[in-house]
Regions:
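Nucleotide-state-sensitive switch-loop elements of NTP-binding domains
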Residues: 2-8, 13, 17-148
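Non-catalytic alpha-helical coupling and interface elements of nucleotide-dependent molecular machines
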Residues: 16, 27, 31, 109-113, ...
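Short, aromatic/basic amphipathic alpha-helical patches
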Residues: 47-54, 174-181, 330-336
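A short acidic, often aromatic-flanked loop/helix-cap motif at beta-alpha or helix-coil junctions
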Residues: 65-66, 195-200, 285, 355-358
Length: 362
């Protein structure tokens, strides 16, 4: 019986990084893990490319949440089992997603009762997003409606992974863990850092040894609070190629940073935010991956170029609290400005931008 683990949680909390960290740990234990990346919109998403570059067995389900693609999900799980001989499959759901416990786990248990061993339904939280639901309710320049999604994701989780603890002082970690235990005491809570590896082994060992109890949790899916939150979010995906026509290499990391700064400036000008902007770029024999987790935060590089580049093949994804028409315009303008500054010739292969509740997208 295949083991299957779904990991949800906040936009930018580190779901993909956590899955990769777990996969690397489980591989070292002699198991064969696989990762199934799920998001809305097109194929060739940043998370899929980054996961594949890590060396893990990886596939994607795109176009919609796995909550609504059960037959496709089961087909991929079987393929991992039969072709890759995977012992366990880890998959995420989009960062705005709730209801996965019901729509994924309960449905699999009903319709495929003897085929999959379901690990505890899991959510990743991070210190910055948690600040929005702490008693002081910090202002993260995100719509008020986002607090509902953050809270709902934790309420339906059987396991909470409190990630990025390497960014906290000991007293901050103690405060946040006390809050999680008080308000989400139904869940098993692990403190960890997927980036540094702290706490990864303990969490992974528990997740693969325990089974989901399949609790019934009403998180208000489809209700007015859910719809109000979804209405504030837009998705942007683009694939593009840039090349130096003069052949003189430039700093690819600086180009990515300038592009992100141009996006930040434009979002701030219209008082909008991007809970998660991410880019994966393939250059000459190496790759870079960068993220921006909001207009008030610094740019983070999970991987950077070690040498100047003359051409880059890039995928960029943005999940923004912004109208889709505004987001589409400012993302394009920011990229073209950065390309002009660095002397890149730009070729756009694919772009899509949509609001979660845009007409025709429901």
């Amino acid at each position: 019986m295949n083991q299957y683990l779904v990991i949800g949680g906040f936009l930018g909390a580190g779901k993909t990084t956590s899955m990769i960290a777990f996969a690397e740990y489980l591989s070292a234990r002699g198991l064969r893990p696989a990762i199934l990346v799920n998001d809305l919109g097109s194929r060739s998403l940043v998370d899929g490319e980054f996961t594949a570059a890590s060396g893990c067995f990886c596939d994607e389900i795109t176009g919609d949440c796995i909550c609504y693609q059960t037959e496709e999900l089961v087909d991929r799980l079987r393929r991992f089992r039969d072709s890759s001989h995977a012992d366990i499959v880890l998959s995420d759901i989009p960062g705005c997603g709730i209801g996965g416990l019901d729509h994924v786990y309960h449905k699999l248990a009903r319709e495929y009762p003897d085929e999959f061993r379901l690990c505890p339904f899991t959510a990743v939280a991070d210190p910055e997003r948690l600040r929005a639901i702490l008693p002081e309710q910090a202002d993260l320049n995100l719509p008020e409606e986002m607090r509902y999604l953050f809270d709902a994701q934790l309420r339906e989780a059987e396991v909470i992974l409190f990630n990025k603890i390497d960014t906290l002082r000991p007293e901050e970690l103690a405060r946040d863990m006390a809050f999680l235990r008080e308000h989400y005491g139904h869940a098993k809570i692990f403190a960890m850092s997927a980036r540094s590896g702290a706490g990864v082994a303990e969490a992974a060992d528990y997740l693969i040894s325990a089974r989901s109890a399949l609790p019934e949790v009403d998180v208000g899916y489809g209700g007015p609070e859910f719809l109000a939150a979804e209405q504030r979010l837009s998705w942007y995906n683009r694939k593009f190629f840039v090349r130096k026509t003069d052949g003189i290499p430039v700093d690819g990391n600086a180009f990515i940073s300038d592009y992100f700064e141009a996006v930040r400036t434009r979002l701030q000008a219209v008082q909008r935010n991007v809970p998660h902007l991410k880019l994966f770029a393939n250059g000459a024999g190496e790759a870079a991956k960068a993220s921006l987790l909001g207009v008030d935060y610094g740019i983070e590089f999970d991987r950077s170029f070690s040498a100047p580049q003359t051409e880059l093949r890039c995928a960029v994804n943005a999940r923004a609290a912004c109208e889709s028409e505004v987001l589409d315009f400012l993302m394009d303008a920011a990229l073209r400005d950065a390309c002009r500054k660095f002397g890149w010739k730009l070729h756009v292969f694919f772009t899509e931008c949509f609001g979660m509740t845009d007409e025709g997208n429901e």
